[in-house]
């Protein structure tokens, strides 16, 4: 059967897609086709605008026909229209498989109805978002009720210590909280409960925390897990206190304490839309009322502008990094900018004007207009733009029922989106989109965006343009370079000429070539004026070559002359930094923000920044998570290196920050790995059923453990767990605890070490675990303790001196620290200890020390391994710690060499003068090592350098190990 004549109403580029679905549709029985005949125009439109609708029509034609004949597509639903039918269907669910199947089929039916009405009937977007929100709310609440009843049969019902019955409260954040959920969106939830206590009336009792955690886990699985019937909603729990490392469910008291003591500005922003959607709704709303002082300040909070500005800046960096200019949510002039405009007024003035304490954006926008906080015209323009962008968002997502805000890259996809929006084609739609985005961007700049200085007018660059274009003779070009302050004119001229004549430059596309022709004169002039060497020029030209096919970076430098100045300075001072930026040009973005470039954030800010970045990545997008972690590390290590070069950070702070970066990443990786494993296998079984936290910890050894990391340090790690190996996990696919923790450890290593296009994050060395490479990847704390007491070699106890817990469960970390203290403070035979430490040092020196050259003398001094170097000092520290910690346990409180040396001086083991001298030399040697690392050079110096210090260390070694 030929397609109806209405096919000609659609752009020709999408005819093949419509025809394909139409041909399959025509294979339905004649009786079915006849029943559909009066709906052919709508069916054709559905095929044109949505693969999701088309596939459901072909999969379940009878259901779709019933939907159309009952006129459900012509009327709005109320909340009861979702709740009543789902509650009835679930009343017959006898087991969890029934629950999962019913939820998914119900979601599919209702989502078909909603998307049909949105894209075929073109209903108001607010109707669509309200109905999607009601669907989600219904699925959450009904699933929670079913699982609660099921668990109560086994454990009884939770009660407070005063005997009051308790229920879980599910808080919806973001779009769901505001009843503004998209047609294909995940749901951001937080689980909480009123009071601590325990269950009553079941076969065995659980404390409330454990009960509600298990309840929450099962609820997530019921909604999020993908089965043969699909999923219900993707669930994101990362907005809860402490993020992925936090407890899945917290009491009201713990929630209030967290937000009062540790709440961040971006969490205030997130809490604006929070709403209780399931469980004890009344109690949930009482909790949110108690949290309002955290969100809305009594004074006019001008600091909110800067906080949102920082959030927007972070998002802009990600948009640039990921090339998301076509993203209508986070891109320029997108939905997020409108949200920020509205929410900055809410955060600033909501404490003084309760009318602004609303969840719905358009309602709040109306209040801002009424209160005179936004001009009438601006409010109208923002409202119109917001509605357009939200409708466009639905059109994009409705194509395949996928959570995306990216304009389709292919022509067919764009045309289908335009049709869904009611336009004759993408051209007309794009004109309207650009108009709205320009308008939003203008208003955002007026209200929130930080004013940036216009690029400085450069002096006349005619000569430099002529040099780059090859219009100057060689002697003229070299004379220009010399006159401008460059004393290696010939080498630079030859390098520039070679680049200009290269095939890669000759075959550049027009836009890229124009950007290069604008950039190169500026670069050459800046190089000459900074008296840059040929080596600096070579490094910068390597960068230019690296970005020839990604000329947006050249545009960035053209528009930001200050960034070019910083670039030349850093490339001149550090070969290592130059190499980092050449291999990862995305780091150029860091140069735009000189304030943060030379002031690395503290540990709290580091964790906060990484958490915000990871929150914007879907839970199941492992590739993007890994890329984000790699960029985070590189960007922050670059900041440390820049500060190191400028000497705004002393040596110890450099190592501190490099260590903080590693710890922050490890914490995030552990949380990501744990969440993935628990989702797949359930939580490990514990002999104490009340335990429900991670019970896993990462121990750092070596440079990480000693808080002494350098730019190229790897991670020496040991993994410990606190669960019985005889028990198994709680998931449907259950595995033994030991298998679970082994796979968890493997996944952590995989996330840290897998090489992507951006490289790895860190190299990981696990050889310091009990029994080394032949031992278990993850040991229990008790097995670790037994090994250290009965089997460990002296060198392993030396390594333990520089160890500390860096991530994971606080309880397991505390257990490790106790084991460490007990082992290090044991009494040891001094003579045996002395012999074993000296023997190990001799072996290391024989293996790693510098060998004499043909003249019989060493050609250089290895800062780390040669006599009088870093390892000698570390061995003396470890020997003294093991020798004297039994008598002076304060010696091993810390794991870093400097503080151990200070403790040895305070205890009188070393004289104060000797301890101070060793600290000074240790810092000096490490500072030389850092400087060499920043030049991509090995840790070696000339044999006549630092002679006095090296000889002093050798002499002190003899004194320490004298019999």
Swiss-Prot record:
Transmembrane residue ranges: none
Enzyme class: transferase
Reaction(s) catalysed by this chain's protein: [glutamine synthetase]-O(4)-(5'-adenylyl)-L-tyrosine + phosphate = [glutamine synthetase]-L-tyrosine + ADP; [glutamine synthetase]-L-tyrosine + ATP = [glutamine synthetase]-O(4)-(5'-adenylyl)-L-tyrosine + diphosphate
Cofactor: Mg(2+)
Protein origin, superkingdom: Bacteria
InterPro entries: GlnE, GlnE_rpt_dom, NT_sf, PII_UdlTrfase/GS_AdlTrfase
Any one Gene Ontology cellular component term annotated for this protein: cytosol
EC numbers, comma separated: 2.7.7.89, 2.7.7.42
Region feature (Adenylyl removase): 1-451
One annotated GO biological process: regulation of glutamine family amino acid metabolic process
Start and end residues of each stretch annotated as Adenylyl transferase: 461-963
Assigned protein family: Belongs to the GlnE family.
HAMAP family, A to Z: GlnE
Function: Involved in the regulation of glutamine synthetase GlnA, a key enzyme in the process to assimilate ammonia. When cellular nitrogen levels are high, the C-terminal adenylyl transferase (AT) inactivates GlnA by covalent transfer of an adenylyl group from ATP to specific tyrosine residue of GlnA, thus reducing its activity. Conversely, when nitrogen levels are low, the N-terminal adenylyl removase (AR) activates GlnA by removing the adenylyl group by phosphorolysis, increasing its activity.
Protein name listed in UniProt: Bifunctional glutamine synthetase adenylyltransferase/adenylyl-removing enzyme
Phylogenetic lineage: Bacteria, Pseudomonadati, Pseudomonadota, Gammaproteobacteria, Oceanospirillales
